[in-house]
Amino acid sequence: MTTENGAVVMRKIFRENLVGIFLLSCIALMANLAIADQANPIVIMKTTDGDITIELFADKSPITVKNFLRYADEGHFDGTVFHRVIPNFMIQGGGFTAVLEEKRTFAPIVNESRNKLHNTRGTVAMARTSDPDSAAAQFFINQRSNLRLDWSPGKDGYTVFGKVTNGMQVVDIIALSDTGPAQAMTARGPSVFQDVPVKPVVILSVSRLSP
């Protein structure tokens, strides 16, 4: 092989390597974009006791997350309170105003607790009645692990659809609120609630940090 032919071969190999590197870079970029598109939504919940950042598990609880974001986007949670607070258990909110009047909701959603996500400390789950498919707007944040609330064969659980990623100290502060009984107005009529914070803990807003 002459020196000239060798140079031609080397240039060809170099060009082929460049093309290969370019193609690999394009594939990697497309993969990263696909991952970004599939990323779970992040919301920030601003309360009178501080901010709570929550990742929503759209990949595991798509119906529940879509429902929660619908309420958030329409401002339903703004001005509602954590109306049920039990230390070493959970804090519940999303359904009542500061004067404990129940807000109107959309139709309830199907229970997704078969996703087998666990009610561990810091997770966010839907509140409901004894009817497993009765969840609407109310949710709770587990202050401790409450695995008895999970789905198991023959028993519907409470659907976990998110997790606190920042602000768990705020949840702990809320859980320590002084509580007592209070008169509430529900959709079914007057009722006395237990475990209501004496000083209302208000959700100022719930907004998206990422889609």
Model-derived features with residue positions:
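Bacterial N-terminal signal peptides
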Residues: 19-31
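Cyclophilin-like peptidyl-prolyl cis-trans isomerases
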Residues: 6, 11, 29-211
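Bacterial N-terminal signal peptides that target proteins for export
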Residues: 4, 9-22
